[in-house]
Amino acid sequence: MQVISFFSAKGGTGKSTFNMLLASYLKYVLGKRVMVLDLDAPGYNLSSTREREADGMLQENPSFDANSLYPIRKIEDLTRSHIKVEIADLRNLEEDYDYVVIDCPGSLVQTDASFQMLAAGVFTLIVIPMDIDGMGIASSYSLGEVCKSLGQPFLLFFNKVYWQEKKELYAQFESFFADGGMRVSSHRVKNSVKLRRDADGTAAYMRSSVCFPMKEIKATVPEIIELFEEVLAYAGRRDTG
């Protein structure tokens, strides 16, 4: 079983969107057994999206089977003692799931659930989305340093990329991270308003926990699929190596 999380200690990087899309890609495209743990208090974005989508599906089709969806567990008790219980329970799920995707709170201090899970070695891979600004670069580098100190495998990638920005600038930052022993994916995800919209009954969405909108993704941000394939291949190597 592989445990993956798109995670950033800086808000607004799109981590929850990528966690949702990865889980949907694994379940609805690859046919994998997937569970999502939602620890992202107080908003619990993934849980609220699932509730809204499931209600909509039932209204459209009363015979809809919610068991056909991957489960999203909302973890409301984020105390240190309970997170220890969650970590122990997680290690007992290997027979039931191929992947567990965890959406963590967007902060990293030693009292956080995120840090506790990192320190416990829960994750097969941490994937760090980053913006090309000073604060985003600094935050991502600091998180990479924490992962390195804990022996946690991780992969960085650029999100919200504007193609008119100079490619040389991205290359410079990639070299900066490489000098620090940090791997940056070559798959840069371009900026898209649609990527920030939940399913709303129209074609103008990319975020969904009840399907993977392959047509819309391929038409707008096909690099997401390439990124996911890289993430899964890298996690697979770490899991077996």
Label each region the model flagged.
Residues 1-7:
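Extreme N-terminal, non-catalytic leader segments
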Residues 111-134:
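Inter-motif core of Ras-like GTPase G domains
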Residues 32-34, 100, 126, 153-154, ...:
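Hydrophobic anchor at the start of a short beta-strand
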Residues 102-103, 126-131, 156-160:
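Conserved beta-strand segments of the P-loop GTPase G domain that flank and frequently precede/overlap
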Residues 162-213:
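Beta-strand-loop-alpha "switch" segments that mediate conformational coupling across diverse proteins
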Residues 205-241:
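NTP-binding/hydrolysis catalytic cores, primarily Walker-type P-loop NTPases
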Residues 137-151, 156:
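Conserved C-terminal guanine-recognition region of P-loop GTPase G domains, centered on the G4
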